[in-house]
Amino acid sequence: MSQPLLQSHLTSLPLIHRGKVRDLYAVGDDHLLIVTTDRVSAFDVILPTPIPGKGEVLTKISEFWFRKLEHIVPNQLADMSLAEAVPDAAERAPLEGRSLVVKRLKALPIEAVVRGYLIGSGWKDYQKTGQVCGNPLPAGLQLADRLPEPIYTPSTKAAVGDHDENVDFDYTAELVGPELAAQVRQTALALYKAAAEYALARGIIIADTKFEFGLDDEGVLHLIDEALTPDSSRFWPADTYRPGISPPSFDKQFVRDYLETLDWNKQAPGPELPPDVVQKTTEKYREALLRLTGAS
């Protein structure tokens, strides 16, 4: 495993943006370099402690899904290698295994969330209204129940430090037009269903996930950002799944659970994480990679 990377520092390429986890660089006019760091965020706050190897795991899982699902929708992956984008070997070394060179696409201002199970904010919404983000559901469902059919519950993309806001389909139609909004919904549901079926055969339930999409110059929809990672999805072990209880996750649940024990107001700056929480979180990310792809 390489050294933990909290922040990338490239001098050969212009930095466009630092997100919660990813650093984005321009590679000419037509490509981007996505560097997935070991930063971890919780409650929309970036924490000061890295999770070693997390960036490499997220990159491998995303690349796996991009290729696995490209029959459903084109994706951002480009033919350019990392060596072509960053020719200097010393500058390139910290980026190996955690970087993707991608096409530069016009990102849509929508988080395309698909939920297959009743958990998190969806469960809270259901308890109050009998619906999830305006989608009516049968009465009598329990926490973590599988939904009769996956539902599409889009949200707006928030700036770093802000919270994404759930919106209805009509709002997304106003943002991008009804035809494109419908295509995003249909594509997100198709991606989720295909991925959930594959993952379940490997012992992982994908309870929900978040996709992002972009358009090329011809207006063709592409899957961008990350795909079905433990950061953008809830992964549960299928062998211990029981409706009525909140299942453990293959993600930063250890981080969230630890932070809930602290007297912290969930605003920046975030607290340091203890070594045992870091270790358990690292192991969970690696287990997700192994189960899904067979790689370690």
From Swiss-Prot:
> Which Gene Ontology cellular-component terms appear in the entry?
cytoplasm
Tell me the keywords, alphabetical order: ATP-binding, Ligase, Nucleotide-binding, Purine biosynthesis
Q: Which Gene3D superfamilies match?
A: ATP-grasp fold, B domain, Phosphorylase Kinase, domain 1
A molecular function (GO) term: ATP binding
The EC number(s) this enzyme carries: 6.3.2.6
> InterPro entries attached here?
SAICAR_synt/ADE2_N, SAICAR_synth, SAICAR_synthetase_CS
Q: Mind telling me which SUPFAM superfamilies this protein's record contains?
A: SAICAR synthase-like (SSF56104)
Q: Which reaction does it catalyse?
A: 5-amino-1-(5-phospho-D-ribosyl)imidazole-4-carboxylate + L-aspartate + ATP = (2S)-2-[5-amino-1-(5-phospho-beta-D-ribosyl)imidazole-4-carboxamido]succinate + ADP + phosphate + 2 H(+)
Top-level class of the enzyme under EC nomenclature = ligase
| Pathway of action | Purine metabolism; IMP biosynthesis via de novo pathway; 5-amino-1-(5-phospho-D-ribosyl)imidazole-4-carboxamide from 5-amino-1-(5-phospho-D-ribosyl)imidazole-4-carboxylate: step 1/2
Q: Name one GO biological process term.
A: 'de novo' IMP biosynthetic process
The UniProt similarity line reads: Belongs to the SAICAR synthetase family.
- Which HAMAP family would you find in this protein's record? SAICAR_synth
Q: What protein name is recorded for this chain? A: Phosphoribosylaminoimidazole-succinocarboxamide synthase
Q: Which organism is it from?
A: Thioalkalivibrio sulfidiphilus (strain HL-EbGR7)
